[in-house]
């Protein structure tokens, strides 16, 4: 069982449609959000004492979803006819790096809509084995 408390001072509340500009904490058990409240109220929760405390910088927001990506792309306008001639290993490594970029920008779910040969499956398998992090 994993218990974490994420704390910050700015959060986007998509349900209310507003930005909360005050100290806020989020109590999470495994992958379920248990409570979102003031740090004072969260610290009085019975799970707080055993929780890993994580201080966040920047804005806390719900995970973003990108429904159309091609992870193996270089992002520099390299045309498809060049990508098909590029070594699969290089494309897979580039795809892993692009997955990290997505995570760093707040994307927690994505759908890769096409990759050369088995490179997309290589990235997925590496993620499933815990070798790389992906959304």
Describe these PLM feature segments.
Residues 24, 51-52, 107:
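Surface-exposed loop/turn positions
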Residues 37, 55-57, 75:
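Residues at the C-termini of beta-strands that transition into short coil/loop
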Residues 59-126:
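Metal-associated gating/positioning segment near the N- to mid-region
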Residues 5, 50-55:
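Conserved beta-strand scaffold positions in the cores of enzyme catalytic domains, especially
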Residues 125-135:
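Alpha-helix-loop-beta-strand connector modules within alpha/beta enzyme cores
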Residues 1-47, 60:
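N-terminal metal-binding scaffold of metallo-dependent hydrolase/deaminase domains
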């Amino acid at each position: 069982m994993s218990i974490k408390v994420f704390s910050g001072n700015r959060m986007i509340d998509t349900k209310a449609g507003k930005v909360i500009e005050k100290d806020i904490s989020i109590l999470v058990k495994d992958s379920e959000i248990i409570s979102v409240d003031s740090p004072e109220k969260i610290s009085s929760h019975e799970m707080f004492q055993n929780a890993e405390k994580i201080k966040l910088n920047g804005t806390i927001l719900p995970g973003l979803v990108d429904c159309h990506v091609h992870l193996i792309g270089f992002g520099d306008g390299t045309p498809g006819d060049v990508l098909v001639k590029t070594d699969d290993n290089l494309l897979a490594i580039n795809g892993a790096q692009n997955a990290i970029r997505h995570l760093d920008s707040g994307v927690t779910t994505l759908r890769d809509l096409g990759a050369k040969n088995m490179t997309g499956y290589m990235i997925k398998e590496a993620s499933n084995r815990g070798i790389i992090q992906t959304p």
